[in-house]
UniProtKB/Swiss-Prot annotation:
Catalysed transformations (reactions): echinenone + 2 AH2 + 2 O2 = canthaxanthin + 2 A + 3 H2O; all-trans-beta-carotene + 2 AH2 + 2 O2 = echinenone + 2 A + 3 H2O
Protein name: Beta-carotene 4-ketolase 3
Induction note: Induced by salt stress.
Species this chain originates from: Haematococcus lacustris (Green alga)
GO cellular component, one term: membrane
Amino acid sequence: MHVASALMVEQKGSEAAASSPDVLRAWATQYHMPSESSDAARPALKHAYKPPASDAKGITMALTIIGTWTAVFLHAIFQIRLPTSMDQLHWLPVSEATAQLLGGSSSLLHIAAVFIVLEFLYTGLFITTHDAMHGTIALRNRQLNDLLGNICISLYAWFDYSMLHRKHWEHHNHTGEVGKDPDFHKGNPGLVPWFASFMSSYMSLWQFARLAWWAVVMQMLGAPMANLLVFMAAAPILSAFRLFYFGTYLPHKPGPGPAAGSQVMAWFRAKTSEASDVMSFLTCYHFDLHWEHHRWPFAPWWQLPHCRRLSGRGLVPALA
C-alpha cells in the first residue's frame, strides 16, 4: 500500500471517530503540548491526529489488562509448583500420578509460559499507567483515569503514582536534557549505567516497604517464597528493563562520539521503530513508536500505529 493511500484511509477513519475540540482544549489545561521549536517537530502535523470519540475503548483496554494480569498472577503465585531439586525437573506436562512422583512440581514448559505471559502483562500494567499519566485512558473523566493508573502501578510494583506523574512530565518538558530529564542518562549514555540511574531515580524506601508488606500478605495466604521471587520480583524487573530499552534507551539514545554524554536529545529527535504493528505490540505495546508519542501525547498506546501512519515515519517496507 502506498503511503498516500494509507494516510487517506487513516485520516477518514480518524475524522469519523474524532472527538470535540473541547476535549483537547480541556486536556491542554491539565497536561502539556510538545514544543514546536524546530521544523523537525513537524508543526503542520499538530492537529493531524484526533483522539477517540469515546472513552469506552480506553477503559475496556485498561480493565482487560488488569483482569488478565490478576488471573495469571494468582495462578502463578498460588498454583505453579516450582521444582526444588534437579530430580523434579521435567519439560512437559505429565499425569497427576507422575507429577506426584516428581514432587508435584509443574513442568518447565508450563512455568516458562506463565512467566512469559505474566511479564508481558506486567509491561501492560505500566503502559496503562503511562496512558493514565497522559490522561488517555479516560480523556473525559480525570478521576477514573487516575484511579485506574493508581491501581495499575500499585499492582506493578507499588510505585508512587503522583511522583511518577510529576517526573514523567518533566521528561516530556525537558526531553533529552542532562540534569533536567529524569529519564535521561546522567552523563553516561551506556546501557547499564543509564538503566541503573533510571531505576534508582524512581525507587524509594516507602515503595520497598509496601512491596515487603505485599509479599508478607501473599505468604500469609499461602504463596511460596520461591514463587514470589520469580513471579513478583523477577518478572516485573525484566518488564522494567523491556520498558526502558524499547521506550527510553533506543528512542532517546545519543549518537556516537566523544560528545555523546552531553548531546541534547530533544523530543523531535526521538527514534521510531520500523517494526510491523504486530511486532511493535509484542515488543512493548507500541512504546517503540516514540516520536509519535511525543508528537501527540494525548494518543493512547493502542492508537500509536495509526499515528505512525499519519506521520509517515519508521514505516515498514510494506507500507512505503
